[in-house]
């Protein structure tokens, strides 16, 4: 399962194998555009005519010089087309879905590093860039013969050995936490770093059906120090209506001083081997950079809950012509929620939430299918003395009938502030899953209005819990409310990948200008923590 690494501002190598060894699913809260005024992007630009093929697919207008620039930003794509002359490469690009590809590029060019030895990726069952327009049906790229899968671990370079991380062992969890804290994802300016607490790791890595052998570590043989990791958890997803048992890959991390040891491809091969032995032949993962080949790409958006603090830590700049007090006022939220019957989720709501959420998610081309146990583990906080809360979930209960009509959740992932004398952390909430019965009305009548009210209430509740920012992607039905609820565009992109499964590109909620577009909904409906 090819979980990748990155060094990106919203989740981001030289080579796979010589790279920075990091692969997150979210990113530290860094944005130079957060909560600048929204709604003005694209003014003065002409809309493409639906009847103009060139307008519909910008690739048809590519010149050789434009193609050269595109390839410069895409080491992966450049590797795929190596050996072609400029005209042939340009023609090859014209045949690809460049509109989707451009939308999928990170907004920040410095995030486009080569994850390379694409010799490695060419050996893996992943979609090639030049296969985007393939007429091949959806399905596995490679049929795995279980009797040909090695029972022995992939050999490591001398001086290192495989270990299984014990998430139940306090010492192991502490060491894993320290590896991630010091060597996992930072933003591009090295101002923020994820702070994965032991409680978060237990929540993320011990979902129902979790397997201890999928928590893979590498130690230095002499010192016993943990120097690398890659993890997986089982899940069931639906791809265009077809159910798949997959592994969600996460926490690929290599110690900064060991990124010349070619550990990354070995980690990928080893987690793949272990999953194959358990009869799981597909995986899903998210990366902030472009690799072969994303099935979708979503953009990050951020909503300030404590704008002044975000400004003081360097997250939210002061827009030209504005003042601090004006920005604080602009981001003010009401003191009370508006959704009738809204209350914290309880254990008695599990069945109703599972039913509502799964029906809601069926509307998307790529979505998770939740079991009752997964709803219980991932979406319901259990009150325990001294226990850290990771997820906050709410339901709207209809008066009289007591029917659950709405559900919404967010989870917490704190980021450490690395270079600030006043603040040591940013408390970030991530918009998680939500669902509403309004989605099933004819022509989705009232859906936008309902979500504007429901998610605004989520912002209010997160503010009351003293969160500083709410992060969200352009997936689910988020394009209906992001800009109106004052979410600001971030500088990061999150690409979705399927390992050993081919499907056509899936909408990521953004248009060709990389802006939220209500017409681009219905694509991504799965969130990897």
From Swiss-Prot:
Tetradecanoyl-CoA binds at residues 118-121, 252-254, 260-264. InterPro entries: Acyl_CoA_acyltransferase, NMT, NMT_C, NMT_CS, NMT_N. It is found in: Cytoplasm. One of its GO terms (molecular function) is glycylpeptide N-tetradecanoyltransferase activity. Residues 1-10, 26-40 have a biased composition (Polar residues). Its EC number is 2.3.1.97. Adds a myristoyl group to the N-terminal glycine residue of certain cellular proteins. This is Glycylpeptide N-tetradecanoyltransferase. The lineage of its organism: Eukaryota, Fungi, Dikarya, Ascomycota, Pezizomycotina.
